């Protein structure tokens, strides 16, 4: 079970975007995440009239390592860590500081 999943709200704790918040768009296999509006890079694309792609400089989100982000706890308005607890025979994610369920 992963500590950070798609659609989780996270806060960046290290790097050029430190302090920014965003939603996880994609979780990649090698502990990397794509977060909306964070870690933007510019890509130069060639025009391709066959597929209708207009050329130019396109800004897009690049993957960042999961160690540079922390899950955002809305109750405390701070970054938090994730732990696991078994309730009713199911393993759930909980915030370490408040012991409340992440997916609640």
Swiss-Prot record:
One of its GO terms (molecular function) is rRNA binding. The keyword RNA-binding applies. Pfam families: KOW (PF00467), ribosomal_L24 (PF17136). Keywords: Ribonucleoprotein, Ribosomal protein, RNA-binding, rRNA-binding. Gene3D superfamilies: 2.30.30.30. GO terms for cellular component: ribonucleoprotein complex; ribosome. GO terms for biological process: translation. The keyword Membrane does not apply. It comes from the Bacteria. Belongs to the universal ribosomal protein uL24 family. Part of the 50S ribosomal subunit. One of two assembly initiator proteins, it binds directly to the 5'-end of the 23S rRNA, where it nucleates assembly of the 50S subunit. This is Large ribosomal subunit protein uL24. It comes from Pseudomonas syringae pv. syringae (strain B728a).
């Amino acid at each position: 079970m992963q500590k950070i999943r798609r659609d989780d709200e996270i806060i960046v704790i290290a790097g050029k975007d430190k302090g920014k918040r965003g939603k996880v768009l994609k979780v990649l296999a090698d502990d990397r995440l794509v977060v909306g509006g964070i870690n933007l890079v510019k890509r130069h694309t060639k025009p391709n009239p066959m597929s209708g792609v207009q050329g130019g400089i396109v800004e897009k989100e690049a993957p960042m390592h999961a160690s540079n982000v922390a899950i955002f706890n809305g109750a405390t308005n701070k970054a938090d860590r994730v732990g696991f607890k078994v309730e009713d025979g199911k393993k759930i994610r909980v915030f370490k500081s408040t012991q409340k369920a992440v997916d609640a």
